[in-house]
Amino acid sequence: VQALLRPLFITSWLIDDFLADQQFFGARRMLLSSASSKTAYGTAFQLAQREGIEVIGLTSPGNVAFCESLGCYHRVVTYDALDQIDGATPSVYIDFAGSVGLRQRIHAHFTGLAYSCSVGASHVGDLGGAGQLPGPRPVMFFAPAQVKKRHADWGAQGLNERLVAAWNQFSAAVSSGPQPWLV
């Protein structure tokens, strides 16, 4: 579990911490593309523990059941069914897919988009710039900047204690329970 997930979980934890530190840019709905990816899963796990935050996983039809089984998405919606989600509700888009086509569709549909966070590129066949987009300009998440900020805020020990506590909770969730994700 450690070797496979811990490096990705650190990024997940930092994304959650960054968004919370920014008060979720005034939004209460988080939209995560590539919801079945390990980093999206870790991020959703963290976000789902926050009071008043709705976590919606966006994925392909073949990954819906898996994403639902993770237990941290309030809803799982396929990429071709974005219109099932109210676009006017203030939302944050956390883009793990990196798909230019999906990013364009997200920005066009979600008129209440408060922040667009680019994290990854799991859809390698559809990468690139999206040109002019409605709504906020996508901003690449840079994990070292959040580490630096939290190191200054909490010190090395405080940062490590928080991260280890979150990791222990996540690692227990993925390796135990009625349907462990990793055994």
Protein language model regions, located:
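Terminal helix/beta-alpha structural elements that buttress the NAD(P)+-binding lobe
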Residues: V1-V183
